[in-house]
């Protein structure tokens, strides 16, 4: 391929640290914390910066998922491999998310962060959580399944529902594959359209420091550092549990499959910082599609595992749900015996699968779970409403790492992982990646395109 020398040149070029997205986002987050702490009104006024950045990302998520999934499926030789990939992915998601739920349940019972608070449920202001409870009541198994089917194709893309877009994309990819050579012009158009979408992402990501700055300034300005003190034990317990889950559980999975969790975290450090600033793992979805394919996983695997994982493989959210539910019981002196906790676990095995990777979705699922269990006071949600935003950072970070691990593992299970490329990319740490060029690095389209045809002699 004529693009190979270009890729090697790009991967060996280093840039000054102040030009790296990693450094810029760190500085932006620190400045945002300082502004929010010392000038809270100004910090709250900066909220549109964070909201605007997330909206820009959401604007292109649906078309990027569509292009990635359709191109991956339509370009496959054997359609059985798609079903195999999906089956292995769902198996992995169920096993690991169940482990996450169990770990959260065990830790909260051992540490008991809510014990001794002696909160009277009748004194809690439930008005602030009414919207979450209402949204949570809509979370049922049948409703979730029916919601995956869009009313219209346009509606799926207009609403930006990841699972609806994914479902249509899979069906479209299968249909396009059945057309054979007759459908090749459509596939070529989708490949070229994907190039445009990924280049739009390049432009949007240059605004990531501004988005992280605005979101962090608002969070600190609106809730203040003082709000962390009252319920600090729960927060510290949750953060430590998430860290241990990543290092021990995901680390063990990585070791069993021949790579290091620490190198993987280093490789996606820029995406982690973006998530830290915005509190939403969805903000890093487009770049994760890029990074995972560059890491050696085939496009068809990445296109299925990453979007699906954003609803079915939210490890951080799973830990949060069990810990928060039992914490509310402890704080309100609501007795929970082993039967109640098993019931809670079984309900969460289902309800946790409806949590999308957006800010606040975990809280809605928690409201749905408390309503479904019945034994726990729903009004107790008011206890953690003030710190939920701070806990969402740990949830989103753990979710992102969990989906990165899942993609590599599933790709290896189905024989769609280039292990040599995996090791070389992890060894480099992604430190030399200057800018995403899908036509050069991602294999978004197979074969030459007008974009890479004129750039094959350039040095990036």
From Swiss-Prot:
GO terms for cellular component: plasma membrane. The chain crosses the membrane at residues 20-40, 56-76, 88-108, 153-173, 200-220, 234-254, 301-321, 342-362, 364-384. Residues 438-460 are annotated as: Disordered. Disulfide bonds: none annotated. It is a multi-pass membrane protein. SUPFAM superfamilies: Proton glutamate symport protein. It holds the Pfam family SDF. Keywords: Cell inner membrane, Cell membrane, Membrane, Symport, Transmembrane, Transmembrane helix, Transport. It is found in: Cell inner membrane. The keyword Transport applies. GO terms for biological process: L-aspartate transmembrane transport. One of its GO terms (molecular function) is succinate transmembrane transporter activity. InterPro entries: C4_dicarb_transport (IPR023954), Na-dicarboxylate_symporter (IPR001991), Na-dicarboxylate_symporter_CS (IPR018107), Na:dicarbo_symporter_sf (IPR036458). Belongs to the dicarboxylate/amino acid:cation symporter (DAACS) (TC 2.A.23) family. NCBIfam families: PRK01663.1, PRK13027.1. Responsible for the transport of dicarboxylates such as succinate, fumarate, and malate from the periplasm across the membrane. This is C4-dicarboxylate transport protein. It comes from Pseudomonas savastanoi pv. phaseolicola (strain 1448A / Race 6) (Pseudomonas syringae pv. phaseolicola (strain 1448A / Race 6)).
């Amino acid at each position: 391929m004529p693009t190979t020398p270009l890729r090697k040149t790009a991967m060996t070029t280093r840039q000054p640290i102040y030009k790296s997205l990693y450094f810029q986002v760190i500085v932006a987050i620190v400045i945002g914390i300082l502004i929010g702490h010392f000038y809270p009104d100004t910090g709250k006024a900066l909220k549109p910066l964070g909201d605007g950045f997330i909206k820009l990302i959401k604007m292109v998520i649906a078309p990027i998922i569509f292009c990635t999934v359709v191109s991956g499926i339509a370009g496959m030789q054997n359609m059985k491999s798609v079903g195999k990939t999906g089956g292995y992915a769902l198996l992995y998601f169920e096993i690991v998310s169940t482990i996450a739920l169990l770990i959260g349940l065990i830790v909260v019972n051992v540490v008991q962060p809510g014990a001794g608070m002696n909160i009277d449920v009748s004194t809690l202001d439930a008005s602030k959580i009414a919207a979450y409870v209402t949204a949570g009541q809509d979370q049922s198994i049948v409703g979730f399944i029916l919601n995956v089917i869009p009313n219209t194709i346009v509606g799926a893309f207009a609403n930006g529902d990841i699972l609806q877009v994914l479902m249509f994309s899979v069906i479209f990819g299968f249909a396009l594959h059945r057309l054979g050579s007759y459908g090749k012009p459509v596939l070529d158009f989708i490949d070229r359209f994907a190039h445009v979408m990924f280049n739009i992402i390049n432009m949007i990501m240059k605004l990531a420091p501004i988005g992280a700055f605005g979101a962090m300034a608002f969070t600190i300005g609106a809730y203040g550092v003082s709000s962390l003190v009252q319920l600090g034990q729960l927060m510290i317990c949750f953060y430590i549990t998430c860290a241990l889950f990543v290092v021990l559980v995901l680390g063990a999975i990585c070791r069993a499959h021949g790579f290091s969790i620490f190198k993987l975290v280093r490789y996606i450090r820029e995406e982690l910082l973006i998530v830290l600033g915005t509190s939403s793992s969805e903000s890093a979805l487009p770049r994760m599609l890029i990074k995972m394919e560059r890491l050696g996983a085939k496009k068809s695997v990445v296109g299925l595992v990453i979007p699906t994982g954003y609803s079915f493989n939210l490890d951080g959210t799973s830990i949060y749900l069990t810990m928060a539910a039992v914490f509310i019981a402890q704080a309100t002196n609501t007795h929970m015996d082993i039967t109640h906790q098993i019931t809670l676990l079984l309900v969460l095995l289902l309800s946790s699968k409806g949590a999308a990777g957006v800010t606040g979705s975990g809280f809605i699922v928690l409201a749905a779970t408390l309503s479904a269990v019945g034994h726990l006071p729903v009004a107790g949600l008011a206890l953690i409403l003030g710190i939920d935003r701070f806990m969402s950072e740990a949830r989103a970070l753990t979710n992102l790492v969990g989906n990165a691990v899942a993609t590599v593992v599933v790709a290896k299970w189905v024989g769609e992982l280039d292990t040599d490329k995996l090791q070389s990319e992890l060894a480099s740490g992604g430190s030399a990646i200057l800018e995403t060029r899908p036509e050069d690095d991602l294999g978004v389209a197979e074969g030459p395109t007008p974009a890479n045809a004129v750039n094959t002699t350039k040095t990036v």
